């Protein structure tokens, strides 16, 4: 459970993406955008990559799959916690600082949401949260995506719709 002592100070950030016009989007994975070997951080991305994106003439950055995920090899597309940014790259405040700084630079920020499937793991995430294999997915094989080795959402369920829309609002 993340509970910072002080709320994040957005310093009056009131970014208005509608003033940008046509978007020229730079897509990046925070953990893989660094030149060094290893997992990059939100802080490194803020300090080193955002200025390059701005200098190169982009007006938006799309952050690939930032939600918490147990397997780094999935590039963040095996989501386990839909309401938590990846702890591999830093703290939630460091991600907020990345967004705040991008806005200061005039860059819109687009967050890549993964709502097609989720990690099938039993120890992390929402699979078998209620003891069944179908709280958020169809039961049995119909709820399994073999190519991604993950669980599929059952979009016909009202609970799934509410869950995913809540995630969009988050």
Description of each model-found segment:
Residues 4:
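NUDIX/MutT-family hydrolases
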Residues 7, 13-20, 29-170:
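Substrate-binding/active-site clefts of carbohydrate-active enzymes
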């Amino acid at each position: 459970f993340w509970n910072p002592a002080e709320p994040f100070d957005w310093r009056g950030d009131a970014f208005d993406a509608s003033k940008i016009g046509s978007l020229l989007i730079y897509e990046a994975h925070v953990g893989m955008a660094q030149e060094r070997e290893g997992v990059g951080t939100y802080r490194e991305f803020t300090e080193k990559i955002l200025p390059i994106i701005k200098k190169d003439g982009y007006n938006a950055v799309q952050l690939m799959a930032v939600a918490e995920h147990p397997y780094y090899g999935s590039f963040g597309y095996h989501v386990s916690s839909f309401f938590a940014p990846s702890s591999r790259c830093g703290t939630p405040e460091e991600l907020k600082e990345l967004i705040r700084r991008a806005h200061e630079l005039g860059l819109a920020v687009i967050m890549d949401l993964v709502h097609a499937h989720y990690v099938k793991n039993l120890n992390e995430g929402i699979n078998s949260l209620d003891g069944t294999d179908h709280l958020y997915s169809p039961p049995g094989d119909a709820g399994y995506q073999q190519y991604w080795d993950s669980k599929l959402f059952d979009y016909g369920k009202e609970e799934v719709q509410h869950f995913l829309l809540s995630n969009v609002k988050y």
